């Protein structure tokens, strides 16, 4: 979701809109999941 697996920057920008999150990346077996980090 949120751009994954093809557009990791979309995932990153999505996570930046979440309070307390500094970014995100695609994770999981096929990079299908957008994972946010602090």
Curated annotation (Swiss-Prot):
The keyword Transcription does not apply. Disulfide bonds join 4-26, 11-34, 15-36. Keywords: Antibiotic, Antimicrobial, Defensin, Disulfide bond, Immunity, Innate immunity, Secreted. It comes from the Eukaryota. One of its GO terms (cellular component) is extracellular region. It is found in: Secreted. SUPFAM superfamilies: Scorpion toxin-like. The keyword Membrane does not apply. GO terms for biological process: defense response to bacterium; innate immune response. Transmembrane segments: none annotated. InterPro entries: Defensin_invertebrate/fungal, Scorpion_toxin-like_sf. Its main location: secreted. Mediates the inducible antibacterial activity in larvae of A.cyanea. Belongs to the invertebrate defensin family. Type 2 subfamily. This is Defensin. It comes from Aeshna cyanea (Southern hawker dragonfly).
């Amino acid at each position: 979701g949120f751009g994954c697996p093809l557009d990791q920057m979309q995932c990153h920008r999505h996570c930046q809109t979440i309070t307390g999150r500094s970014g995100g990346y695609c994770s999981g077996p096929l990079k299908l999941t957008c994972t946010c980090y602090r």
